[in-house]
Every structure is written in structure tokens, then in C-alpha cells.
């Protein structure tokens, strides 16, 4: 639903969110990776990396989004912008993965199909 209704999704997030791209292509070494959804927030002056997962939150998801956030910070973010924030939207949250995640820039949220 999110990728098919990006305008609605972005408007539900609140003020200041701007769509940058979905399946946003980045090159890590000799391989391409794709960020599910990349936004920019003009109020917070930072990029927002969003990863969509159809499973319970796993520690591998944290590592994946950290790589994407670091890539954006090192290759796209301007010097006057704040560090990138990551949001993982997953079928089921896992409080233990979040508890032991050392990066407070990452937020996990559950979704429900209606």
C-alpha cells in the first residue's frame, strides 16, 4: 500500500516530509542496493531512510538500514544537514532487537493490514 500511495503516506507522516525516491539505487562496492523509500524532512533538515519489511523485526534489518543511513550521510547529505534517520516498518516489532540496538537514530514501527 505504501509504495502505491506515496502521497497519502507522506501526508500522514506530518509536516515537512518530501518524497525523494522509492527503490532508491545506491552502489556499495560493485553491487547495487535499493532503499525502499527515501524522504527528506525540511523541518528536521535531514534525510529519512524507510525500509519496509513483511516479517518480524530482525537484527539483520538494523544492520541493513545502518548501512543505508551511513551511505546517505557520506555521499548525499550536505554539510549543513543533520544526520539521517532510519525507520523500519515491519509486520511485528521486536522489543529486544530495538533494546539492544545501539543506534538511537533508528525507529521501528509495526503495521497492520486493514
List where the protein language model places each region:
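Charged, terminal alpha-helix-loop-beta segments
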Residues: 1-114
